[in-house]
């Protein structure tokens, strides 16, 4: 349960950042649901092409000085999250505007800890009114662009508490935040993802926080006095950083982390793992995920689902395809597709092979050769190619293109059709091994 899966895990809403909690068959059999979280903070990001409202960025929200308005805005966002079966938005962003060259300043509220805390507390409370969690981030002290994933933020305790922690304290105590994301990099030499002082002493014991803590995506941790390394995850467990984000498959331990080895060596205990699991379960029991698993959908969600626009993509009901375990090929049967002008099909695919694929389209059209029939292909909502054929007068032809799927095992392929009178027999994705 320590490992979250992503990005774009097929176990939760399509195109989202991560799944956590009940993400194995064993845990699901125990009645533990899979929780879902999605980027923010400026609205919901779903990489499969599902529409969502784009919200004003954090700095603009700070400029309003209007907590009531911000709260109402994020109550609406909470309802949109419910519609898309997402349990937590990865936001608000709370880093202080220390360096004007920080490339992510637009996500954050201001240089003022009080304003930051109050605006973010309003966002948290707004989403809670819709039954949604929010993950306040990044905890804490990561405020520059150069070396953003590795820098060490050195500061006094007074500076830390009065500037860089104060906004988080307000969001927890006044807003009731139930999820926190730690940073990349370190504070005073210890990487925040494995800092017991931050994740337990201050956050939980001093502020009374009772939710979950997760890492930033692919963050590292270190043993005090040592360099941070990818396999070093046991300090996260000990610090009460409950969820490491993310791996492609939680059961197989693809990053070869040291949790089991350090458990056997007595460096961490089964009690610490159980404590962290309890935190995750507590979060899920208060989230929409538990109701979705039980098949209980509120009237508000049903109303919103019925109000979808005709061209909206329903991220919860996509066709899911998995590569053949022997050949690693992925076959998209033409019967699954709807090739007509203006239509789009989105499919969730899971590939074990990482690298280039030959994408072989078998298509025909009854039109004459003067006709042009384009099909645009998007991978994770990014345009990759357009395959255009002429009319074939009823003869099946094949067109082959190269598509790289070298990053991650879960993707969303969108096909957009620019013309009528096109028939697709199949689309076959074949790994390029030579």
Language-model segment annotations:
Residues 414-422:
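Short beta-strand-plus-loop segments that form exposed binding edges in beta-rich domains
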Residues 84, 361-367, 418:
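Solvent-exposed strand-to-loop "edge" motifs in beta-rich extracellular domains
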Residues 1-352, 356-360, 374-398, 402-406, ...:
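Glycoside hydrolase catalytic-domain context in secreted enzymes
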Residues 366-376:
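Beta-strand acidic-aromatic groove motif in beta-rich domains, primarily in extracellular
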Residues 368, 392-396, 422-423:
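A short local loop/turn or secondary-structure capping micro-motif enriched for an aromatic residue
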